[in-house]
Swiss-Prot record:
Alphabetical UniProt keywords: Cell projection, Cilium, Flagellum
Ubl conjugation keyword on record: no
GO CC terms of this entry: sperm midpiece
Primary role: Seems to play a role in sperm motility.
Name the UniProt record assigns to this protein: Golgi-associated RAB2 interactor protein 2
Family stated for the protein in its record: Belongs to the GARIN family.
Any single biological process term in GO: flagellated sperm motility
Organism: Bos taurus
UniProt-listed InterPro entries: GARIL-like_Rab2B-bd
PANTHER family: GOLGI-ASSOCIATED RAB2 INTERACTOR PROTEIN 2, PTHR22574
Length: 397
């Protein structure tokens, strides 16, 4: 098929079956544009040629049982610039093609202007042209979407070489222009980045330089001498930093966090019957969140006081509220509740414990103790009896 495509135009030229238009005459696409309907694209020179669409292997693609014939034109949309930037595609109308005519005759015959219709307008910035097969005079058209089309030049044999050389030169020119444009865009993007960084850096430097002046001119201290807080008025410097504050705090008012007081209470319980004497240290973080825990602790203490009998005549409130200073030894911290810490101290011995220890001793020890007490009681009696007898003897003598 390739051989037939290459040789058939030569035979047709030898028989003079078709007339080849003069190269100096404008093409059919340019004549159609000069008609006035497409005024923005009337900007010669225009390079135009007839192509047939093929696949990657060079096989012809048929549309409605006919070869897909297309006229491709490259021109400039701006008359003042000579660099082309537009790709135009035109097709024949269905009435222009006759079934009785041979295929190559219909392809090589120049169509009439009224039957040529402009169907596509593609900016060259979205199109990439390249030479796919120089031997068979095929070019590749790749769109920005990624789709690729392969076109084979269809022209008289006497003008194929010269016409394809023009297309090769045009493709190289377009690729060079595209490379220059990409470099210019990269340089412009880099310059924009550097300009933005320079601007932000200058603003930062200006802010840093202006901050000491702000401190010296707009410092105000609070009324509390223990907590000296410096507030700065930025109302006159909004143009420098361009920072908006959405809070409703006045200028000279400084917000203070609520203070948390740490209170250490040392209580010692020694006069409760039935309960072992114990001393404790309670560390409470006074705040609104722990009032409930503190109240529960007080209620628990009252219940303990009610259950036992107090030996002192002091009231419960005095017993609970009067703190005592004790020496803390053998500290053992335990976690009590959420925020209360209690340390247990070594309790002092009570009389109840002594009685308990006495009761816990074995019977033999207790009997020995009782015998010792009786012996101690009998000793003065014997001494008294001896003294009495000695006195009686003295009287008798």
């Amino acid at each position: 098929m390739k051989k037939s495509n290459r040789k058939s135009p030569t035979r047709i030229d030898e028989k003079d079956d078709i007339c080849v238009p003069d190269s100096k005459d404008p093409g059919e696409l340019q004549n159609m544009l000069n008609g006035g309907e497409y005024a923005p694209f009337v900007s010669p020179p225009i390079l135009e040629s007839n192509f047939i669409q093929v696949n990657r292997r060079g096989e012809s693609i048929y549309l409605h049982n006919r070869a897909n014939w297309v006229t491709v034109g490259i021109c400039s949309s701006n008359p003042t610039t000579k660099t082309p930037n537009v790709m135009l595609l035109a097709h024949l109308t269905p009435t222009a093609q006759k079934d009785s005519e041979p295929l190559f005759t219909s392809l090589l015959t120049s169509p009439s202007p009224e039957n040529l219709v402009l169907t596509r307008f593609l900016p060259l910035q979205f199109v990439t042209l390249s030479v796919h097969d120089a031997e068979n005079m095929r070019i590749k058209v790749k769109l920005v979407s990624g789709r690729a089309y392969y076109l084979q030049l269809c022209a008289p044999a006497c003008k194929q070489e010269a016409l394809f050389c023009q297309w090769v030169e045009l493709i190289s020119l377009l690729n060079k222009e595209k490379a220059k444009a990409s470099k210019v865009s990269e340089v412009s993007s880099l310059s924009e980045i550097t300009n933005s960084t320079d601007i932000t850096g200058s603003v930062d430097i200006m802010d840093i330089a202006a901050f000491p002046a702000i401190q010296t001119s707009h410092l105000s201290t609070c009324s509390d001498p223990n907590n000296d807080v410096e507030s700065v008025d930025f109302s006159e410097f909004t143009d420098i930093t361009d920072v908006t504050d959405d809070t409703d705090i006045p200028e000279n008012e400084v917000t203070e966090a609520p203070d948390i007081n740490i209170v250490t209470e040392v209580t010692e319980v020694t006069d409760i019957c039935g309960v072992t004497a114990s001393s404790g240290v309670r560390v409470v973080f006074e705040n609104d969140d722990i009032l409930k825990a503190k109240q529960e602790e007080k209620e628990k203490m009252e219940n303990i006081l009610k259950s036992g009998c107090l030996r002192d005549t002091k009231s419960k409130n005095e017993f609970r509220e009067s703190p005592k200073r004790v020496t803390i030894s053998n500290l053992a911290l335990t976690f009590e509740g959420e925020r209360c810490f209690q340390t247990t101290l070594t309790p002092e011995e009570d009389e109840t414990e002594k009685s308990k220890e006495m009761s816990d001793r074995p019977r033999e020890i207790r009997t020995m103790d009782s015998e010792s007490t009786t012996l101690k009681a009998e000793e003065p009696r014997s001494r008294r009896t001896d003294s009495d007898t000695s006195d009686k003897c003295k009287l008798l003598n």
